UniProtKB/Swiss-Prot annotation:
Native source organism of the sequence: Shewanella loihica (strain ATCC BAA-1088 / PV-4)
Job of this protein: Specifically methylates the guanine in position 2445 (m2G2445) and the guanine in position 2069 (m7G2069) of 23S rRNA.
Enzyme Commission number, as recorded: 2.1.1.173, 2.1.1.264
Gene assigned in the entry: rlmL
Class in the EC hierarchy, top level: transferase
Alphabetized Gene3D superfamilies for the sequence: 3.30.2130.30, RNA methyltransferase domain (HRMD) like (3.30.750.80), Vaccinia Virus protein VP39 (3.40.50.150)
SUPFAM superfamilies: S-adenosyl-L-methionine-dependent methyltransferases
Descriptive protein name: Ribosomal RNA large subunit methyltransferase K/L
Subcellular location: Cytoplasm
């Protein structure tokens, strides 16, 4: 008997141990990411040829303590390598594990390599060549908790590489993962007609067809690790191959099970057809290009086993939630009597199916932890709900979710008409009106941006996730927006430079109109979009006060107030911001509005330092500083509450007689030091009510605005 380790992804251990037991292996012991077993050589060949779940088969030749480099070297040196491979074969070391004296796998591999070549040399043989890639003979080493296990890669390249796949789709499913899904779903034990409505390149269907046809998964492979092992018995191997070919021929002819697959991507369907042809099961699989939501049951009862798209894989989260909701609706309505199994990494997407799982299992798709849920659909599972009637975990219609839907509809009816009258196409639709749904919803033309506020620590994460799922499910139906045009962001309390950090690089750009001005929006790349909607009336006021005046815009962001000033007839407009990115954006906004000329200046710099250095004066100054900033470009931190008097006293020096300062900020509990400003000879007028747009009336403390003049 020989000792082996069958490596497999985490979560496969139990199913793999059962598979090995069916083969007749002995001394089976589950471990982390694999199973140890014993078997004679002929059975090891059979397992390598027929295992549908294992990733690799390792022949274990040494296992012992290893506390230092010398013990590691001696463990490898004591093995009579000449009896395992020829010095004419190249070799390599696959070393796994770190800890203790093993700081990195390269160190461990190098020690073993030295021991192997030294052993060949000391036995009077020329040393074999070391190959970095594509070695003839591979030594496998595992170090864990002071123990070293040395073995021979018996199977060779990863066993999930069956040999039928030509190329892959964007998110291919490994073959042994598909096989594990078929095993754990119960399909392998009692096979029935099988449907995969998200078939991609066909892996689930092909693996199932190979099972049904008794086709050995490794039958088409061209390379195995044991081929350069000196104890390999070629005659025994060829006998097993001949047996497998005969079984495949008989099984393919006898198979009566049908397999159905579809995908919305015609390119992937064509690829699935080629893969099925390569695997020898093309005649058994019916493939078509179709939206999963249009698929109908091909037979009265069967299995639907699938790996739909999910967040880490493909697609927009809002679109995916809608897809899962509608898929669950369809399954309940049309697939009564079917067994359904779904693999997904996002529990919220699975919950959107609104199906009660018979069983939930954990599987890994590479390093990604996934849930594998099994469902039995009963013939009367046909209840259909409007997405506004989102189900709570208890299974009852959530009253608060319905209230959210009604509020969205009410706000949209009122505000969409108002926005049209105002001459704007971007506005705030909802701002945490209902405390349980702590989000802001903004309309930007035909797109929607949802900003999720950070929930209090007292609310469980599962609850906040479920509520966000409600929001994403309700919105498309409530206001008639395409789910693909909904963008989700998470907004936390802004601190320092965090305010304008980049989030993405997908460049979803639109042009919005505001009182005749045009502005470029970027809905995805940053937390903010390039236009603060709550300052709409403040910008309009800047435009109304700018005619014939020299205007200065500080902390200008994307220059939207500068555009209004220029369109309002300003004599000159100076735009200052620390960020080159936003200054370039401001210049784009000027170009959008046909504004060109030397009278429009764009200056990159620390605004606070620039104020101190400036020797010019202006008639109108608009300043909207951050609540707090400690940018690496600024010498000191800035706090608007602490520093506003100092800031305004410096700013007054830049103000001509008769000039005005429009000062605004977003600190909710900001208190203007009116006494200190009066002492500076300034009069102040609060403009909060005048500059608060209708769409922000529900949040009157969104910003502060003040008109400051010489007394």
């Amino acid at each position: 008997m020989l000792n082996f380790f069958a490596a497999a992804p985490r979560g496969y251990e139990y199913a793999l141990s059962l598979e090995l037991a069916e083969f007749g292996a002995a001394e089976i012991k589950e471990s982390v990411a694999g199973v140890y077993f014993s078997a004679p050589l002929n059975l090891a060949y059979r397992i390598t040829l027929w295992s549908r779940l294992a990733s690799r088969i390792i022949l274990v030749i040494y296992k012992g303590p290893c506390e230092n480099p010398e013990q590691l070297y001696n463990a490898a040196y004591c093995i009579d390598w000449q009896t395992h491979f020829s010095n004419k074969s190249s070799f390599s070391i696959d070393f796994h594990g770190v800890g203790g004296f093993i700081k990195n796998s390269q160190f461990g591999a190098l020690k073993i390599k030295d021991a192997v070549v030294d052993r060949f040399r000391d036995d009077g043989c020329p040393r074999p060549d070391v190959a970095r890639v594509d070695a003839d003979f591979k030594i496998d080493a595992h170090y864990r908790r002071g123990q070293i296990t040395l073995g021979i890669n018996f199977s060779g390249p990863a066993l999930h590489q069956r040999g039928y796949r030509s190329t892959t789709g964007e998110a291919p499913l490994k073959e042994n993962l598909a096989a594990n899904m078929l095993v754990r779903s119960g399909w392998q034990q009692s096979p029935k007609d099988l449907l995969d409505p998200f078939c991609g390149s066909g892996t689930i269907l092909i693996e199932a067809a190979m099972m049904a046809c008794d086709i050995a998964p490794a039958l088409q492979r061209r390379r195995f690790g044991f081929e350069h092992w000196l104890r390999h018995q070629e005659a025994d191997w060829q006998e097993l191959l001949a047996e497998a070919k005969a079984r495949a021929s008989i099984g393919t002819k006898r198979c009566e099970i049908k397999f159905y697959g579809s995908d919305i991507d015609s390119r992937l369907v064509a690829l699935a057809k080629r893969n099925a042809q390569n695997a020898g099961v093309a005649e058994l699989i019916e493939l078509s290009v179709s939206n999963a939501l249009n698929v109908t049951p091909p037979v009265e009862q069967g299995y639907l086993i699938t790996n739909p798209p999910y967040g880490e894989r493909l697609g927009n989260v809002t679109s995916l939630l809608q897809l899962y909701y509608q898929l669950g609706d369809k399954l309940k309505a049309e697939f009564g009597g079917w067994q359904v199994a779904v693999l997904n990494s996002d529990i919220e997407l699975l919950s959107a199916l609104k199906l009660k799982a018979d069983k939930q299992m954990k599987m890994y798709n590479g390093a990604l932890e996934c849930a594998f849920n099994l469902y039995t659909l009963h013939a009367n599972s046909t209840r259909r709900l409007d997405p506004s009637q989102v189900l709570s975990q208890g299974g009852e219609v959530s009253e608060v979710a319905t209230a959210f839907s009604n509020r969205i509809k009410k706000n949209h009816k009122q505000l969409s008409k108002w926005a049209q009258r105002e001459g704007i196409d971007s506005y705030r639709l909802y701002d945490a009106d209902i405390p349980e749904y702590n989000v802001a919803v903004d309309i930007y033309l035909d797109h929607v941006v949802i900003q999720e506020y950070s929930a209090p620590k007292s609310i469980p994460e599962a609850v906040t996730k479920r509520r966000l799922t409600d929001v994403l499910l309700v919105l498309p139906q409530a206001i008639g927006v395409d789910p693909d045009k909904i963008i989700l962001k998470t907004r936390e309390r802004q601190k320092g430079t965090n305010q304008y950090q980049k989030l993405d690089a997908t460049k979803l750009e639109l042009v919005t109109t505001e009182y005749g001005a045009k502005f470029k929006l970027n809905l995805k790349d940053y937390l903010d979009t390039g236009l603060f909607l709550d300052h709409r009336l403040t910008r309009k006021l800047v435009g109304e006060k700018s005619k014939g005046r020299d205007v200065l815009n500080l902390f200008a962001y994307t220059g939207s107030a500068s555009v209004h000033a220029a369109l309002g007839g300003a004599k000159s407009v100076t735009t200052v911001d620390m960020s080159n990115t936003y200054l370039n954006w401001a210049q784009d906004n000027f170009e959008l509005n046909g504004l060109k000329g030397k009278q429009y200046q764009f200056i990159q710099g620390d605004c606070l330092q620039w104020i101190d250095d400036c020797d010019q004066q202006y008639d109108l100054i608009f300043i909207d500083p951050p609540t707090f900033s400690n940018s690496k470009r600024m010498e000191d931190s800035f706090d608007v509450q602490r520093d506003h008097v100092k800031l305004l006293s410096a700013l007054v020096k830049l103000l001509r007689p008769g000039g005005e300062i429009l000062f605004s900020n977003n600190k909710r509990k900001f208190k203007m030091d009116s006494e200190a400003l009066s002492a500076l000879g300034l009069s102040i007028t609060n403009l909060d009510k005048q500059t608060l747009p209708l769409d922000y009336k529900r949040n009157p403390h969104i910003h502060n605005t003040w008109l400051i003049q010489h007394a």
